[in-house]
């Protein structure tokens, strides 16, 4: 491996306190929608980890939660379902 080769960090599953940040248009029910979608795949979601942040101009809202990630398949399913809502711009 050379100095220019960068490898993504390995995640060991299950991974407790795995952060998921979702950014979408601010609007009524956006945070509830995000939590609902994530809870389908991570029923043990602790709502006390929910963090909301408005963008500077108030147009966007970021919703961050911590889950216990059980595997890549779970994370991919969460991402796909969030994008399918049509209200999500980014999932980090």
Swiss-Prot record:
One Pfam assignment: DUF493
Query: According to its UniProt record, which protein family does this protein belong to?
Result: Belongs to the UPF0250 family.
- Origin species: Azotobacter vinelandii (strain DJ / ATCC BAA-1303)
Its domain of life?
Bacteria
GO terms for cellular component: cytosol
User: Which protein are we looking at?
Assistant: UPF0250 protein Avin_08440
